[in-house]
Amino acid sequence: MVQGMNRRDVLRAGAALTAGSTLAAPTVFAQGTGGNLRFAFWDHWVPGSNEALQVLGRQWAERSRVNLTLDFINTTGNQLQLTAAAQAQARSGHDGISLGPWDIGAYADQLEPVDDLIAKLIATHGPINPVAEFLAKRDGAWRGVPATSGTQNKPACVRFDLMQQHAGLDVRAMWPARAERGPGADTWNWDTFLAAAEKCHAAGVPFGLPMGQFTDAVDWVGALFLSYGAAMTDARGNPTIRNNAKLRTAIDMAVKISKFLPNDVWAWDDGSNNRALISGRSALVFNPPSAWAVAKRDAPQVAEQCWTIPMPSGPEGRFIAYLPWTTGIWAFGRNKGAAKSFLEFISSREAAEATTIRSGGYDIPPFGSMSDFKVWETEGPPVGSVFNYPLKPHHQATASIAFSPAPPELASQLYIQAMNTKVIARVAQGGESMDQALGWLEREINNMRRG
């Protein structure tokens, strides 16, 4: 995600990137006479995850007799996003590229439709996550293939010892490492969450929930809003602010929660919550297993006390923050047939499981049929800690992305501008009344719609 940048900004910056960017050394599989193919993938933060794609690439290249090159580009300084912008502007570069959640919309007219490939994948693996579909389709056509590598959920990673000691909640009993709900799971809602947040705050181990303008903050607040049925617009983009009791209730709950968080959460970035958990100062964060994975290395005494559970439910159900990657094929690419073949290969169950294993369970396949990989049962310590990380039927939950059901073009602006956390901050930090904050929100949305 390009924080605070619109497409014009990205294109301008991207033009400069082609001359000055430094990429990791590419992996080249020179196999034969099937032509050349070059892909740019997100440079995975988990050690070994890139190697999983390299192994898969070698297997496919040998079978297909294609000269395949894989580049891995990180998102530090938005390098990957700017690379995509530069290539779209120049109409040359890789044949395919990893695209963040909202990037498909920026380049839809320059991406090859992949409806034929998606139909084959669905016929084999079943339905694709609806959020991935919402983001990857434009004007009824699939413009990218939902990816496994890098795709993440953001459920609750809980210090089960601290939660039980200070809030009286046994999260391992509530959500065991089995496909079943335990005692207390049915009452794991935002009211229970608020009470636990207050108790852990009083004990000096507050929940580590960012409230600023980075993705971790926008994502968890987005899931909270959806669980209250609190939409800022309808599916056509018309504001639904006035007389919206559900939106008021959701904002009120978020304001109440914020009172029991660290004072500086309004300035936290996406690493701050990780650091809070790893340091032992926090009893709960909403995150993929990234913080836990680092704790296994740097603070094993913390990692051994962590347990992943679904997000709390609200009056309209339980929603899990979900952030998918998509792989697009440029329409100006020279080997689009081979590109589709390669993406079909790495979308198989066997390939998805290989990348998920190498990521320590971090990666989430886009197909619900793949939520049963053994890696989530066996990763530890403690063994079973991430069993409930992927969405499972007994969670009775829905994957979500903030600001749906707004049209993707508008939702992406609302997301990048973090309008959900900003409106909360105006009440919780700015001293505004609910009516004042909602009036500001409606004006901002109307300005975005006018362009």
Briefly describe each language-model feature range.
Residues 138-150, 154-156, 184-239, 246, ...:
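Extracytoplasmic/periplasmic solute-binding protein
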Residues 73-83, 187-192, 265-278:
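Short helix-initiation/N-cap motifs at beta->coil->alpha
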Residues 100-157, 161, 305-312, 384-392:
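Hinge/lid segment of periplasmic solute-binding proteins
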Residues 116-129, 134, 172-186, 228-249, ...:
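Short, solvent-exposed loop/beta-turn-alpha elements that line the ligand-binding surface or hinge
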Residues 191-200, 236-267, 311:
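Glycine-centered hinge/linker elements that transmit conformational signals in sensory
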Residues 95-98, 283-287:
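Paired acidic/hydrophobic, glycine-rich loop segments that form the ligand-binding mouth/hinge
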Residues 290-303, 315-419, 450:
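C-terminal lobe and pocket-closing loops
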Residues 2-108, 119-126, 151, 169-176, ...:
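Conserved N-terminal structural module of periplasmic/extracytoplasmic solute-binding proteins
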